[in-house]
A protein has these predicted regions:
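N-terminal subdomain of lithium-sensitive/metallo-dependent phosphomonoesterases centered on the IMPase/IPPase/PAP
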Residues: 1-88
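Residues within alpha-helical transmembrane segments of multi-pass membrane proteins, especially transporters
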Residues: 21, 104-106
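Short, function-defining helix-loop hinge/capping sites that tune catalysis or transport
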Residues: 55, 94-97, 128
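Short loop/turn microsegments at loop-to-beta-strand junctions
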Residues: 79-83, 103, 114
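Conserved structural elements of the adenylate-forming
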Residues: 98-102
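Acidic beta-strand-loop-alpha-helix segment within the catalytic core
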Residues: 106-162
Length: 162
């Protein structure tokens, strides 16, 4: 049986290190090294290097797990445990030096999500949870609203443009 609390603690550290790498690379980012995956999707050397670092650390943490990663590390897997990794979620924002962009890491067992960590780099916000635990933002427990009437609800969304 996996110790999800311990795994989550490690994944939080991995996400923070990846975020520090993104922050450092953003200051000297070379836009000429950006590739187009398609008309509205980009990839940079920063995406690829961030993924390489994250995957290496996750392999050490849970060697038996497979990977599905945004930039192609690993492949679709039949393994029970599988890491889902987006090493730079918001590449277009990153390229244009706009917030937000983040590091997203999850662990699943078959179809069940076990761990989720999202680090929003620009705001220094670390969201995390694991199966059976509450959700947290920077170590403060957070909750969804109990408002069920949409007329009384406050809903916020950010447009994702290319």
């Amino acid at each position: 049986m996996l110790d999800l609390e311990k795994i989550t603690l490690n994944v939080r550290e991995i996400a923070l290190r990846a975020g520090a790498f993104l922050r450092n690379e953003r200051s000297g980012f070379d836009r000429s090294k950006v590739e187009k995956k398609n008309a509205h999707d980009y990839v940079s050397y920063v995406d690829k290097e961030s993924e390489r670092r994250i995957v290496a650390q996750l392999r050490e943490l849970l060697p038996e797990a497979g990977f599905i990663a945004e930039e192609g590390s690993g492949s679709l897997t039949t393994e029970n445990y599988c890491w889902l990794v987006d090493p730079l979620d918001g590449t277009t924002n990153f390229i244009h030096n706009n917030a937000p962009y983040c590091v997203s890491i999850a662990l699943r067992n078959k179809e069940e999500l076990l761990v989720g960590v999202v680090y929003e780099v620009c705001r220094d916000e670390l969201y995390w949870t694991y199966k059976g635990a509450p959700s947290y933002l920077n170590n403060k427990e957070i909750h969804v609203s109990d408002v069920s009437d949409m007329d009384e609800a406050f809903v916020r969304s950010e447009e994702h443009t290319s």
